[in-house]
Design a protein with these regions (language model features):
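Glycine-rich, anion-gripping cofactor-binding loops and their flanking helix/strand elements
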Residues: 82, 232-314, 428-460, 473-476, ...
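Glycine-rich, acidic loop regions that bind phosphate or pyrophosphate groups
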Residues: 120-163, 256-372, 505
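Phosphate/pyrophosphate-binding active-site segments
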Residues: 2-6, 10-21, 158, 223, ...
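Active-site diphosphate/adenylate-binding microenvironment
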Residues: 27-30, 35, 45-48, 53-58, ...
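Thiamine diphosphate
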Residues: 51-123, 127-135, 247, 283, 288, 293-297, 324-326, 419-497, ...
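Structural signature of the thiamine diphosphate
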Residues: 2-4, 40-41, 82-119, 143-196, ...
């Protein structure tokens, strides 16, 4: 049975320095390598097999937060990484603990989040068959390889630093995705030569070759109906995206992970609208589409079939495989989003692309007025499509928006109130962040992600949005937020069950089964965990409760009953 410290922060121990500083235990070699890469925060749960790691955290300057479940640790570390741009680190013990965090690793893989998961593993000479060891698995690494970019099982203490450097090289120079490092139990406690500290070198931003840049710029210069689609891979390039959109008078639509890259009140912004039939029809009629850092995936367009674009597609992505996945690029630009868009802007500013376009008989003048009018009409069409389904959430979303500072962080769950409601309708500025579990679509993300985001930026407001079904996958993390005295607002739209699945069963003509739950007093449960709980029966009540929750040093769970919304 796993030994767990009950404190949310965990007990900190000062290590006894080894007699020979060149010889370290595997646990200390690991923590030394993390500190050398600038890691100052870890998430995880201490257990019998990982105590040698925990023994050294404080001495090397790593703070630690212990959620109440390993998935919570994974989601918190994921959000920490998304908000800071620094890899999130999560520590588990062996076996069931590692499998518990696997869902969070899969979510980070889907959303291209730099998450490093570290666990002990079976001893080096483990026979890979049942011998009755505590938490025994035949191969943890094989399990994690299915949801991570790689799983690295080290074979010596000296190899630990190299494994950490390998993970940070991935995070810095390739499409960032989660990695797992496994340290065999006998190495974790063994004292061996650790070798020098190895750190991954900084990577220069990758830029496509000049020929490709000029080809793309020429297409954009002669485009009569350009459009931009921005995904999570454009994060960090919001200013370049907006400048290019204004230069081209091109409306901008974002994916869920690209939400608020461009101010959603901007006259050219369509916000998160790829799922809208009206916006899809408009997008397919564009003569040039510039897609930056997006898979153009089913999770954003809500259909398994690729969009039938009639024009030419320019794709900017750090991952070469994306150029031919789903919708193949007519002009593939493999590179860092910000650096690539800078190069495109320079090519357009120099007039080289325009000269090429004029020589080909094309003369186009960007017309912002027409583009602004088009954007207003498309937003109205999108809202008309969804009003029967979404209208009841809108006043509550306006109340939430009114309570938010410009740089607030909003976390959400795979819940109707989020993907139908907040993603398209909660309008945010580009200083804000919206964190959503796209693609893999796990439940229970919002609350632990809010804890990780608040740890990353304690001076920013953090609000979690969820449904009652999703929240109860991780509701125990209210205890973590309460122990940390985090002023979090957790807004829960309560329909007493799994509303989306209930609706799908009804649409199929099936009798709803296993989707209706007895209503739980979630507000009372929040108080039992050490936070505050209340119910909002109107948008006005929600606004009032939020204003208090965001300055109260404890989590506040606000229930909005579905019948009220």
């Amino acid at each position: 049975m796993t030994s767990v410290h009950e404190s949310a922060v965990g007990t900190r121990h000062s290590p006894t320095p080894p007699p020979d500083p060149t010889h370290l235990t595997g646990g200390e070699a690991l923590v030394r390598a993390l500190a050398a890469h600038g890691i100052t925060q870890a998430f995880g749960i201490p257990g019998t097999h990982n105590l040698e790691i925990y023994r050294h955290l404080t001495a090397y300057g790593l703070a630690h937060i212990a959620p109440r479940h390993e998935q919570g640790a994974g989601y918190a570390a994921d959000a920490y990484a998304r908000v800071t741009g620094t890899p999130g680190v999560a520590i588990t013990t062996t076996g069931p603990a590692l499998l518990n965090i696997a869902a969070a690793v899969g979510q980070a893989y889907s959303d291209s989040v730099p998450l490093l998961v570290i666990s002990p593993g079976m001893p080096l000479r483990h026979p890979r068959q049942s011998t009755g060891l505590l938490h025994e698995m035949r191969s943890q690494s094989e399990a994690l390889r299915n949801v991570a970019a790689f799983s690295h099982r080290v074979s010596s203490v000296a190899e630990i630093g190299a494994a950490v450097a390998r993970a940070f090289t991935l995070f810095r120079s390739e499409r960032p995705r989660p990695a797992h490092i496994e340290i065999p139990l006998d190495l974790l406690e063994a004292t061996e030569p650790a070798g020098p500290v190895r750190t991954a070198p900084p990577a220069a931003p990758r830029v496509p070759d000049a020929v490709r840049i000029e080809e793309a710029a020429a297409l954009l210069a002669r485009a009569e109906r350009p459009a931009l689609v921005l995904g999570g891979g454009a994060r960090g390039a919001g200013a370049q995206c907006l400048a290019l959109a204004e230069q081209l008078a091109a409306p901008v639509v974002t994916t869920a992970n690209g939400k608020a890259l461009v101010d959603e009140d901007h006259p050219l912004s369509l916000g998160v609208s790829l799922h809208s039939p009206a916006v899809q029809e408009w997008l397919t009629s564009r003569d040039v589409v510039l897609a930056v850092g997006t898979e153009l995936a089913e999770s954003d367009i809500w259909t398994a079939e690729p969009l039938p674009l009639q024009g030419e597609l320019i794709r900017v992505d750090l991952d070469p495989a994306q150029m031919y996945a789903g919708l193949p690029a007519d002009v593939p630009l493999v590179g860092d989003a910000a650096a690539t868009l800078d190069a495109l802007t320079v090519a357009l500013d120099l007039g080289l692309a325009l000269e090429t376009a004029v020589a080909a008989g094309h003369t186009v003048t960007a017309d912002p007025t027409t583009a602004h009018t088009e954007t207003v009409a498309l937003k109205a069409a999108r809202d008309d499509e969804s009003r029967p389904r979404d209208a009841h959430w809108l006043p509550y979303l306006e109340a939430i928006r009114g309570a938010l500072a410009p740089d607030a962080v909003v976390t959400s769950d795979s819940a109707q109130c989020c993907y139908y409601g907040a993603l398209p309708h909660l309008t945010l500025g580009r200083r804000a962040r919206y964190l959503h579990p796209t693609g893999f679509g796990t439940l229970g993300y919002a609350l632990p992600a809010a804890i990780g985001a608040k740890a990353a930026c304690p001076d920013r407001q953090v609000v979690a949005l969820s449904g009652d079904g999703g929240l109860q996958f991780s509701i125990q993390e209210l205890a973590t937020a309460a122990a940390l005295q985090q002023p979090l607002a957790v807004v829960v739209f309560d329909n007493s069950g799994y509303g989306e699945i209930r609706d799908e069963m009804n649409a199929r003509g099936d009798a709803p089964l296993a989707v209706d739950h007895a209503r739980v007093d979630l507000a009372a449960l929040a108080r039992a965990y050490g936070g505050h709980g209340a119910t909002a029966h109107s948008p006005e009540e929600l606004a009032k409760l939020l204003s208090t929750a965001l300055i109260t040093p404890a989590p506040t769970l606000i229930v909005v009953p579905e019948e009220s919304a």
